[in-house]
Amino acid sequence: MGASTSSPPLVRRHHWIVRLTHWATVIVLAGMIASGLQIYEAYARFGNRGGPYFVSPFDGAQFPHWSRLGGWLAGALNWHFALAWPLVAFGLLYLGYLVRSGEWRALLFRPRDVRGAIEMTKYYLHLRREHPPQGKHNPLQKLAYTGVIGLGALAVLTGFAVYKPTQLAWLTTLFGGFQAARYWHFWIVWIFVGFTIMHVFLVFAVDPASLRAMLSGSYRGKFPSHD
């Protein structure tokens, strides 16, 4: 008789709330960005007419029609505001799960992770052969996810500062005024875009099993990242 082979064990990785909020946020955020580009087209600069303004390489830019949502300013604003509330709700649901389950401990970047982040950087740059030891998330992932959560909070706050500059004058002032809040809100979005591109690249290049786990919640065997 031939030697029996058993399939690798099924390992649970992502709770359904994590998967739901992840994919729902992808869809809603795409709509927010597309409608935001249409809103920006209405006045493609950061400053009052005839006054000083924040310099941006996107001054006067016209984004491709396929990348914009809403058709015109009013339509884009309707989409943007309608999608903002689900985005906030999904964010709060995700944060609530992290706190209730204790998963925040495995996700939060702390000072003790600095050395591990340096070693992971060396590994990705092929300056280190062995994969550094890690837990559920490696230190660079912790740094990225902690930063994204912080940026998400800033995106919401700057968004409200632009949405209600009179009613929330204290918040608008905190960010340097209406045009400054617009400026920070706009650039936070591009940081999200950059993070998304890098995130997708690393998923396929380093941890393809993580995509299966984010779809089904589980994976068989070990991640390529040795977690």
Language model features with spans:
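Membrane-embedded alpha-helical bundles that constitute the cytochrome b-like, heme-associated redox core
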Residues: 1-227
